[in-house]
C-alpha cells in the first residue's frame, strides 16, 4: 500500500516538473506559447464567448488557426467574436480556469 502511494507521489512530481529547453533557459516552447503564462497550468489557448467573474469561461473553442503572438491570438479570436484566454485543459467547451494572455489589453 505504501509502495503505491510513494510511486504515485513520485510520478506526479515528475510529470508536474516543467520541461527545460536544451540551453536551460526555462520552459520549452512546445509546452506553452509565448502569449500564455509560463508553466503547465494555463497553457491552452482558447477563444471564449462568456467570461464569468474573470475566472470561469464558457463556450470556448480552440483558435481556428495557430497564433504565434498575443496580437495575432487576439485578432484570431476577434474574427470569430470571442475573447482570447489561456486556460487549463477545457472539458466540453467549459474552461473553468482561465486567465488573460500575457500582454493582452482586455
Curated annotation (Swiss-Prot):
Name its cellular compartments: Secreted; Secreted, Cell wall
Give the residue range of the signal peptide.
1-16
The main location is secreted
Sorted UniProt keywords: Cell wall, Disulfide bond, Secreted, Signal
Q: Does the keyword Secreted feature in the UniProt annotation?
A: yes
Record InterPro entries: Cerato-ulmin_hydrophobin (IPR010636), Hydrophobin_sf (IPR036686)
Name a single GO cellular component: extracellular region
Q: Which Pfam families match?
A: Hydrophobin_2 (PF06766)
Under what conditions is it induced?
A: Expression is up-regulated under Alternaria alternata cell wall and Alternaria alternata fermentation liquid treatments. Expression is also up-regulated under nutritional stress conditions. Expression is down-regulated in the presence of poplar leaf powder but up-regulated in the presence of poplar root powder.
Q: Which domain of life is it from?
A: Eukaryota
Cysteine disulfide partners in this protein = 36-86, 47-77, 48-60, 87-98
User: Assembly and partners?
Assistant: Homodimer. Homodimers further self-assemble to form highly ordered films at water-air interfaces through intermolecular interactions.
* Protein purpose: Aerial growth, conidiation, and dispersal of filamentous fungi in the environment rely upon a capability of their secreting small amphipathic proteins called hydrophobins (HPBs) with low sequence identity. Class I can self-assemble into an outermost layer of rodlet bundles on aerial cell surfaces, conferring cellular hydrophobicity that supports fungal growth, development and dispersal; whereas Class II form highly ordered films at water-air interfaces through intermolecular interactions but contribute nothing to the rodlet structure.
Q: Which family does it belong to?
A: Belongs to the cerato-ulmin hydrophobin family.
Q: What is this protein called?
A: Class II hydrophobin 6
Q: Which organism is it from?
A: Trichoderma asperellum (strain ATCC 204424 / CBS 433.97 / NBRC 101777)
Amino acid at each position: 500500500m505504501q509502495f503505491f502511494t510513494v510511486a504515485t507521489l513520485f510520478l506526479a512530481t515528475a510529470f508536474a516538473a516543467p520541461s527545460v529547453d536544451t540551453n536551460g533557459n526555462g520552459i520549452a516552447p512546445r509546452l506553452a506559447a509565448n502569449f500564455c503564462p509560463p508553466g503547465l497550468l494555463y497553457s491552452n489557448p482558447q477563444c471564449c464567448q462568456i467570461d464569468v467573474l474573470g475566472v470561469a469561461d464558457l463556450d470556448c473553442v480552440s483558435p481556428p488557426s495557430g497564433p504565434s503572438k498575443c496580437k495575432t491570438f487576439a485578432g484570431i479570436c476577434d474574427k470569430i467574436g470571442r475573447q482570447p484566454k489561456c486556460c487549463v485543459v477545457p472539458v466540453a467547451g467549459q474552461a473553468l480556469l482561465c486567465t488573460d494572455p500575457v500582454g493582452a489589453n482586455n
